[in-house]
Swiss-Prot record:
Record site feature (Involved in the stabilization of negative charge on the oxyanion by the formation of the oxyanion hole), residues: 115-116
Active site: residue positions: 188 (nucleophile)
GO biological process: L-arginine biosynthetic process; ornithine biosynthetic process
GO molecular function: glutamate N-acetyltransferase activity; L-glutamate N-acetyltransferase activity
Protein name: Arginine biosynthesis bifunctional protein ArgJ
Gene Ontology, cellular component aspect: cytoplasm
Positions annotated to bind substrate: 150, 177, 188, 267, 391, 396
Keywords from the UniProt entry: Acyltransferase, Amino-acid biosynthesis, Arginine biosynthesis, Autocatalytic cleavage, Cytoplasm, Multifunctional enzyme, Transferase
Entry function: Catalyzes two activities which are involved in the cyclic version of arginine biosynthesis: the synthesis of N-acetylglutamate from glutamate and acetyl-CoA as the acetyl donor, and of ornithine by transacetylation between N(2)-acetylornithine and glutamate.
Species of origin: Wolinella succinogenes (strain ATCC 29543 / DSM 1740 / CCUG 13145 / JCM 31913 / LMG 7466 / NCTC 11488 / FDC 602W) (Vibrio succinogenes)
Source organism, top-level taxon: Bacteria
Pfam families: ArgJ
Annotated site, Cleavage, chain positions: 187-188
HAMAP family: ArgJ
């Protein structure tokens, strides 16, 4: 039906988009800490945000502009979340946006996104002083992805070209950041998606919601939902091409790649784990069980220790509130079945095989509840000493 090819460029891959990262002095040692994404052509933007009741100022500012609106520029800063800053947080954004528009009159409804420490005013003067370094049209997507990092171990970007059977094509690119305070109730930490596909304005939000459901909504690092979670989609229609099935597939691929990168990059994490739950009474029940596994500290520390302690998995499912029965439950590490509908298969040989699975950097734990047909896969990681160190020293 259509072909999907990985390409370079991240958010700059689609036609008409540019991005860069600059150093505004927010991070130490002159590191990149402010980024922008810009569309040369008129663009529409739609976004989904955190369900945290204390949503940060950039989110409250954005929400005042509507569900889908004209916008060709986003400014992103690290080190400061601009959260719990009240009316002054909004005023600081308005102050910066006015100066941006004065410097670059072609900008339409520029918006802002922030990540970092909660409870401190935005260092707007430092950011304003760095605006002179912005060069619209610069295609430095990798630098932009680096600039938005906080405790991330690596930058996260991806891009695809989609070719339709008639030879027409469009591109989609994205970047994300996130490693800690990840348990999105709708998005991720920060994710910015660009496309030159001619996405209908009235379809943008629904397609975003569909793709988020099985990607960013399916990950957890530490069970905490940020005040700043944002996933933002820009469409500038530059290709003039759109086919909904192909676009949704590409959007899901982009989000899946970035979501699993975020889970893999859990602060100090060494392992990415897919928690596959099947046989639940409904998809909602499967989601509840899978997410309980991603956030269980006992499960996460067992993964860190490469200990196939299946009892912790059973206990977590049993306390998750879903319908379950120990005489129907099956638990596997990879393809190694350790518990089968009331029968304990966990002898020394099975334990070593299961431990061998857990020594891999990426593996799955499968739980068949044996109740119905509901299924869902959530992604998580281990939790070890480094997580405590990173977060204990976060503000130093």
């Amino acid at each position: 039906m259509f072909d999907l090819f990985p390409i370079h460029g991240g958010v700059c891959a689609p036609e008409g988009f540019s991005a860069d990262g600059i150093a505004a002095g927010l991070k130490k040692e002159g590191k990149l800490d402010v980024a922008f994404v810009h569309s040369l052509f008129p663009a529409k933007v739609s976004a989904l945000f955190t369900t945290n009741r204390f949503a940060a100022a950039p989110i409250r500012y954005f929400q005042g502009l509507g569900e889908v609106f004209d916008c060709n520029f986003v400014l992103i800063n690290a080190k400061n979340a601009n959260a719990m800053t009240g009316a002054e947080g909004i005023e600081d954004i308005e102050w910066l946006m006015e100066r941006l528009k004065h410097r670059f009159p072609s900008l339409v409804n520029p918006v802002m996104s922030s990540t970092g420490v909660i409870g401190a005013r935005l260092p707007k003067e430092k950011i304003e002083a760095s605006l002179g370094e912005i060069v619209l049209g610069k295609k430095e997507g990798a630098r932009a992805a680096q600039a938005i990092m906080t405790t991330d171990a690596f930058s996260k970007e991806v891009a695809f070209k989609v070719e339709l059977p008639d030879g027409r094509s469009f591109c989609i690119g994205a970047m994300a950041k996130g490693a800690g305070m990840i348990d999105p109730a709708m998005a991720t930490m920060l994710c910015f998606i660009t496309t030159d596909a001619d996405v209908p304005e009235n379809r943008m939000k629904e397609l975003l919601q569909k793709a988020v459901h099985t990607t960013f909504n399916a990950i957890s690092v530490d069970g905490d939902t940020s005040t700043n979670d944002t996933v933002m989609l820009f469409s500038n229609k530059a290709s003039g091409v759109y086919e909904e099935e192909a676009f949704l597939m590409a959007l899901e691929r982009v989000m899946h790649k970035l979501a699993t990168d975020v889970a893999r990059d859990g602060e100090g994490a060494k392992k990415l784990v897919a928690f596959e739950v099947s046989g639940a009474a409904s998809e909602e029940e499967a989601i509840k069980a899978a997410k309980a596994l991603t956030t269980s500290l006992l499960v996460k520390t067992a993964i860190f220790g490469e200990d196939p302690n299946w009892g912790r998995i059973a206990s977590t499912i049993g306390s998750s509130g879903v319908e379950c029965d120990e005489n129907r439950l099956r638990i596997s590490f990879g393809e190694v079945l350790v518990y089968d509908r009331g029968a304990i298969l966990f002898d020394k040989t099975i334990e070593e095989k299961a431990a061998s699975v857990m020594r891999q950097e990426s593996f799955k734990i499968h739980c068949d509840l044996g109740i119905g047909r509901g299924k869902f896969t959530a992604y998580g990681c281990d939790l070890g000493y480094e997580y405590v160190k990173i977060n204990a020293d976060y503000r130093t």
